[in-house]
Curated annotation (Swiss-Prot):
Major enzyme class: isomerase
Protein name as annotated: Xylose isomerase
MF-aspect GO terms: magnesium ion binding; xylose isomerase activity
TM annotation in the entry: none
Organism: Staphylococcus xylosus
Catalysed conversion reaction: alpha-D-xylose = alpha-D-xylulofuranose
Pfam family, one: AP_endonuc_2
Entry's Gene Ontology cellular component terms: cytoplasm
Family: Belongs to the xylose isomerase family.
EC number: 5.3.1.5
An individual GO BP term: D-xylose metabolic process
Amino acid sequence: MSYFDINKVNYEGPKSNNAFSFKYYNPEEKLGNHSMSELLRFSVAYWHTFTADLSDPFGVGVAERDWDSLDEMEKAKARVEAIFEFMEKTRIDYFCFHDVDISPEGASLKESNENLDIIVELIKEKMDQTGKKLLWNTTNNFTHERFVHGAATSSNAEVFAYAAAKVKKSLEIAKKLGSENFVFWGGREGYESLLNTNMKLELDNLATFFKMAKSYADEIGYTGQFLIEPKPKEPTTHQYDTDVATAHAFLQKYDLDKDFKFNIEANHATLAGHTFQHELRYARDNNMLGSVDANQGHPLLGWDTDESTDVYDTTLAMYEILKNGGLAPGGLNFDAKPRRTSFKQEDLILTHIAGMDTFALGLRVAYKMIEDNFFENIMDEKYKSFNEGIGKKIVEGETSLKELEDYAFNINTINNTSDHLEVIKSQINQYILNINNKD
């Protein structure tokens, strides 16, 4: 059975009016020594694409999906067929999932694991047949009512144990399927109020949880990259991994920073009061950029995520990613869903085409900027006072407050220069327009 009645999506260039074609993403086209598919490493998210029903806090699900009329296990099997057809037709090489995305929870942990075993075998067969790969998997330790107080940070030790058992199973799945990364997102790892929260105990327990996970991965020979996905809130009022800087400090405190990097989501940066580029830059500067959840927050809605369609944002994001040397073994996972009003099955294809093209265009622009040393030249000019004289001594740690005081006494007039920030923004616009015109 075919779930998507279209041909494989092809690159037709920016002048094409075919909605089911790529305008900027040409998988085999090389930029330098790498193809676009190697540089972008696109991934489809199982949850938003194949399990989400487009419900929201004010309305029931409206998504029309061929598999939704089936019973739970048959539905899970149908979704396996659907996602591999989807990846083939969209030319996406990777996928990601939570444990409960791929199979239903049973009446007990044992039954849940048995359900997982059945579906994982089907996924493994499909992976072997198609060459598609698992970018990352993770454990859903936030949806079920047992996680009302958290998972690793729960006040109930039995919940901690249950969450740990689920992670153990997910790590075994990661090894079996060759998952290139393993992600932790702590949607319930935080608090509603400090009035009844032992923050130190909860953070200590969270660190213990991560250490046990890494220890078990080593024990079974799983070598995938471990990733933490920061988010400041939603669903919990205050989540402990608020942003990259906060989570980095946590990892450093508990001596986990050599074992983990970050999976950075664009909309989580927005919720934290940062730009997407800020989070990517902080992670890159600290050698902690591991992977990306590609989406954008709706400017009027905090809780929603859409496919990326902002070329300005994707250009700056791809600049950071290219300067990072790429994302491998991470990738660009479309942790996004269609708008509620885009409820047809074909909209799943169309939204991914939009997101892939937007990142591909951003890649083209960012690559050209790096070729031209655009930002590098700006930085060199702005900070040139630190390349010689007293500035160089400051950078190299070869001066003191006393010497700087003596130096300052001899300054007659301090002359600052304008950043011309508006000119820089205008030049970025011109890069985007020039890339488009060139194609």
